[in-house]
Amino acid sequence: MNKHVFFDNLTASIGAMVAGKKKFFSKSIQSPSFEEQVAAVELELPSLNGEGIYEVRAKTLVGDLDPAFRVAQWKGNEYPTIIYHHGNNERPFNFKKSAKNTFYNIFINTKNAIEANLIVVRAPFHNCTLKQYQESMLDLSNFTAMIATSVRLNEKIIKEIRKESTKPIITTGISLGGWVTNLHRGIFNSSTAYAPIMAGTFLGELFLKSKYRKMASDIALDNLEEIRRILNFDEVFKRRNSQNVFPLLSKYDQFIEYAVQSESYTGYPLKTIECGHVTGAINTKALRDHFDSVLEAIGR
C-alpha cells in the first residue's frame, strides 16, 4: 500500500469513527433532483464594493440557507476572474496557515501572485461547527440543496461580473467544489472555462463504491439505485459539448476514484497527478500549476 492510498484509507476510517451513527443520509434519502433543486433556489447578490466578504440569503426547497462569497483579490475588470468552490468541511474565509483552506494555500499563501481576480464561495452549512454540519448532512435533500445553492450563486456572480467585464471567467473547485463546478457547467455552461479538481459527475459512486462509503449510512447503502438516480449527473454534464473543461484527478485517489470519474472526461484534456485525495489536496504546487495552465489555455 503506497502512502497516498494509506492516508485516504486512514481518513475514511477516522471520519467514520467520528461520525458514529450520524453518517451521511442516515435520516433520509429522499431528495429532489439536482436540476429541481437549482431551479428552486432564489437569491440576490448584495451590492459589490471591492474586496471583502458578502453574505447571501438563499431560499431553497429545504428552507433558507446561508451561502457567502469572498472577493479575496480584485485587480479590475480588465483581468480574468477565478471563482473557487472549496472542499468538504473547509473554512474558505479563514486565511491562516493552520486553517483547512485549499483556496488560501493555492492562491493566497504563496509568493507567486496570480494575475486574476479571485473569488471564493462558501457553501451552505459551512459557517457552523462540525457537529452542526454532520446533523445537516443526515438528510440527503440538505446535501443536494447545498450543492445546488452554490451552483446558483456561481451563476449570479458570473452575471454580475459580465455586466462590466468581457474577460474570461474560470469556475473551479476541489472535491465538493469540483462537483459544484461540473454541475454548473451541465446546467448553465456560462463560464468561459471549468477546472474541476478531484471530482467528476458520478457523485453517487463516492458514497457507494469508493473507500468513502464508510461515511455513508446503511439506508444509503441499501438503496444503491436511488442514490445513483439522485446524485449521479453524468447525463446532465454530457448535454454540453463545448471544449471548456480542464479537469484534474489524482491517480491513487480512494474517494474520487480515477477509473470511475475519468469516464466523465472522455474527449477533454484530463490532467493526472501522482497523488491520493488527501495528498493531492495538499499538493499546492501541482494544483497551482494546473490553474496557471488553464489561464494560459484560455488566453487570460
Language-model-detected regions and their locations in the chain:
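C-terminal catalytic histidine-bearing segment of alpha/beta-hydrolase fold enzymes
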Residues: 266-300
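Primarily recognizes the serine-hydrolase "nucleophile elbow" in alpha/beta-hydrolase
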Residues: 158-212
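Long amphipathic N-terminal alpha/beta scaffold segment
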Residues: 36-78
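The feature captures the conserved acid-bearing segment of alpha/beta-hydrolase catalytic domains
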Residues: 206-267, 271
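Alpha/beta-hydrolase active-site loop
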Residues: 132-164
